[in-house]
UniProtKB/Swiss-Prot annotation:
GO terms for biological process: brain development; locomotory behavior; post-embryonic development; regulation of growth; response to selenium ion; selenium compound metabolic process; sexual reproduction. There is a cross-link at U59-C62 (Cysteinyl-selenocysteine (Sec-Cys)). GO terms for cellular component: extracellular region; extracellular space. Might be responsible for some of the extracellular antioxidant defense properties of selenium or might be involved in the transport of selenium. May supply selenium to tissues such as brain and testis. The C-terminus is not required for endocytic uptake in the proximal tubule epithelium. It comes from Rattus norvegicus (Rat). This is Selenoprotein P.
Length: 385
């Protein structure tokens, strides 16, 4: 109950779903008209809650996201959320088009995967979206949430919660396509949620009673059996704003890089066995200098982007272990990667440099723009031509 309320509150606080990767999406507005070939996916899904995922077939993590989207679809259907249309739009670039079959293979026929025509207007551009973005529309085709990294990672519950909100809550007003069956289902969901409100209250009072006697029991302040020392709830503790654990850098060594300790311990507790070298790397974090190529529209050439990924989440999928960044990074960077053996391989998704970078006329050190980000101050400094 409280977990759901926390997620809903976090989603409310996120501006347009917290997606930093795109310009401000028009909340509760109809999706702009877009077609792929002679098909109109949004028109075809009218009357259902529509989930549009912008995934890149040439990206390993995107393939993993597609597989997780299929798992999420099955999970929601098992919970009774049936009237949902799932749409995946592949990137328009040639590398992604060549690997389109790999992307389509990750999902069932219940999820439509569209290949863009390179001669048509880029759908991602029309939707103000970037790689790994999720756009959730209500039954009338109005945008309820636009989630970008890191909130769109399906290892987090934000996409699932956003879909449920779009399904049962009238965030954008009434919709004539809402059926009586959907209203009855949502009423039952609301009643079931309300019936659980008394249970946490009673449990909370019970814990308060025991807290008063905590010093009498062995004089111990050890964490509970199910709690790792210094651990956080990964699913619900992700801050909804830019205030992402900056204070960790000022605490003593035992609390420094708390996200790493949490991730490693969490993985081990779930049967994910990491080697000693992997655990050391996990605590050290992934800090790589990565080269990025900005979009041609920005008029900028290749730039250098420093991604500092300090709060890692490890998850095993098949024979691979994925390493994901669970924090806000400078607007220029987005870290994600594959944790293989003793190395963290990061890829960097570049965005247009912040306005502050454009205003700084520093003598260039290279033939191309060079933007570096200070991990402590979370500020970017750019040398432009």
């Amino acid at each position: 109950m409280w977990r759901s309320l926390g997620l809903a509150l976090a989603l409310c606080l996120l501006p347009y779903g917290g997606a930093e990767s795109q310009g401000q999406s028009p909340a509760c507005k109809q999706a702009p008209p877009w077609n792929i070939g002679d098909q109109n996916p949004m028109l075809n899904s009218e009357g259902t809650v529509t989930v549009v995922a912008l995934l890149q077939a040439s990206u390993y993590l995107c393939l993993l996201q597609a597989s997780r989207l299929e798992d999420l679809r099955i999970k929601l259907e098992n919970q009774g959320y049936f009237n949902i249309s799932y749409i995946v739009v592949n990137h328009q670039g040639s590398p992604s088009q060549l690997k389109h079959a790999h992307l389509k293979k990750q999902v069932s026929d219940h999820i439509a995967v569209y290949r863009q025509d390179e001669h048509q207007t880029d759908v991602w551009t029309l939707l103000n979206g970037n790689k790994d973005d999720f756009l959730i529309y209500d039954r009338c085709g109005r945008l309820v949430y636009h989630l970008g990294l890191p909130y769109s990672f399906l290892t987090f519950p934000y996409v699932e919660e956003a879909i449920k909100i779009a399904y049962c809550e009238k965030r954008c007003g009434n919709c004539s396509f809402t059926s009586l069956e959907d209203e009855a289902f949502c009423k039952n969901v609301s009643s079931a949620t309300a019936s659980k409100t008394t249970e946490p209250s009673e449990e909370h009072n019970h814990h308060k009673h025991h807290d008063k006697h905590g010093h009498e029991h062995l004089g111990s302040s050890k964490p509970s059996e199910n709690q790792q020392p210094g651990a956080l709830d990964v699913e619900t503790s992700l801050p909804p704003s830019g205030l992402h654990h900056h204070h960790h850098h000022h605490k003593h060594k035992g609390q420094h890089r708390q996200g790493h300790l949490e991730s490693u311990d969490m993985g081990a507790s779930e049967g994910l066995q990491l080697s000693l070298a992997q655990r050391k790397l996990u605590r050290r974090g992934c800090i790589n200098q990565l080269l990025c190529k900005l979009s041609e529209e920005s008029g900028a050439a290749t730039s250098s982007c420093c991604c500092h990924c300090r709060h890692l989440i490890f998850e095993k999928s098949g024979s691979a272990i994925t390493u994901q960044c669970a924090e806000n990074l400078p607007s220029l960077c987005s870290u994600q990667g594959l944790f293989a053996e003793e190395k963290v391989i990061e890829s960097c998704q570049c965005r247009s440099p912040p306005a502050a970078u454009h205003s700084q006329h520093v003598s260039p050190t290279e033939a191309s723009p060079n933007u570096s980000u200070n991990n402590k101050t979370k500020k970017u400094k750019u040398n432009l031509n």
